[in-house]
Curated annotation (Swiss-Prot):
Gene3D superfamilies: Immunoglobulins (2.60.40.10)
Domain of life from the UniProt record: Eukaryota
Record-annotated MSP domain positions: 76-184
Naturally occurring in which organism (per UniProt): Caenorhabditis elegans
Protein name as catalogued: Uncharacterized protein D2007.2
């Protein structure tokens, strides 16, 4: 009996169940024994892979004693959604930057094409546990290309404003960054807020 909706079908792949790393002291029987296979939805497999990667890098969000880099900051900051899609008619896309870290952060937004896109705010500070709305506007243009928006992040010391923090650290500390894709299509449908 065939399903009337193909949207309910999910692609499947296979995954090997492995108990962990094997040592060089295995018997020949252990080496030649096949590992069991299970069927798993590809979306579930992608989720598992993302979870495994994030758990391996979760230690980056905590600064080690003597650390002067800013890579730990980016691990505590997320931007949702990570892609802004526009038609050639332009429009507005709203995103949320969330600070999950324990530190106050300064943010500076840069774009690969400042003539095509306007971003608000350009500079901002975000307190720990708070979020910031990012508004990205694209002008009407027949030019179809992929651009990039970069969220530059520095730890904010004291009560200084973001512009002052970035100016002070211009030659001493490189900011952490999160890149976002800005995509324009010839499709007249509204693509805003999709990932």
């Amino acid at each position: 009996m065939a399903s009337s909706s193909s949207a309910a079908l999910r692609p499947f792949g296979t995954a090997r169940l492995t108990p962990g790393r094997q040592t060089g002291r295995q018997t020949q029987q252990q080496i030649s024994a096949p590992e069991p296979m299970i069927a798993i939805a590809l979306s579930d497999m992608e989720y598992l892979m993302r979870s495994a990667r994030s758990s391996r890098s979760s230690g980056r969000s905590e600064r080690q004693p003597g650390c002067t880099c800013c890579c730990h900051i980016a691990a505590g900051v997320t931007v949702i959604p990570r892609v802004a899609r526009f038609s050639i008619e332009g429009g507005l896309s709203t995103h949320t930057l969330m600070n999950h870290s324990d530190n106050r952060i300064a943010v500076k937004i840069t774009c690969s094409d400042n003539n095509m896109y306007r971003v608000t705010p350009v500079y901002a500070t975000v307190e720990p546990g708070q979020s910031l709305p990012l508004h990205i506007a694209r002008i009407t243009s027949d030019l179809i290309k992929r651009d990039r928006l970069c969220v530059n992040i520095l730890e904010a010391d004291g009560n200084k404003e973001a512009r002052e923090i970035f100016k002070k650290n211009a030659n001493t500390r490189a900011p952490a960054s999160i890149n976002m894709a800005l995509e324009a299509t010839n499709d007249n449908q509204n693509h805003h807020h999709q990932e």
